[in-house]
Amino acid sequence: MPLLNDLVPNKSLLCKLWRIDDSEDIMHPNNELNSDDYQIFLSRKANHMKRQFLASRKLISLVDPDLRVDYENNIPLLSDNRNISISHCEDIVTILISENKGIGIDVERINNKVHSIKSKFLNQKEINYLSGYEESRNLTKAWTAKEAIYKALRMPGIIFSENILIEEFNNESTTGIGKFISTNQEKKFKLYFYDLDNYCLTISQEI
């Protein structure tokens, strides 16, 4: 399972990314997992989900072999109280770690199917500026941006098309700005965009 690279958006964020290699056997965790993680591993029914879970734990062990992931209301938190966000899509698995709160990461494969659901996560202004050149890639980039912000917010009841807004960006953009807006609060996020062959990855950090 070769390591692709470390992404370094800024000094306060640690991001590691792996591509799962089907030629490598990682389906037998042996003694690599603690008892809680082993139960989670067993609960994963599909083999690809098991592989993704093991890959995420291997990434964490590269940061610190003694780290473990605890969960509070299904939200992951590292045992040293740092914050973590995890994302995976097919053979790509990535983790984002920071001492700061308000972080999120998401990775998705670029797919034309995103066109059929764009009205569910974009407002009309966003749809307009994202139409045209490299539309599938930019729609996917917007989707990962909103997912990353959603993960950073860690709150229920969010409507992507209304509460999470992405300022205009283009195909060449490597950074952007996103906002969460509700009736009683507003939060602003710095976005970091990465193109990974047929995937889009976005990191969000509250500013």
Predicted regions mapped to residue ranges:
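Core catalytic alpha/beta fold that binds nucleotide/phospho-ligands
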Residues: 1-207
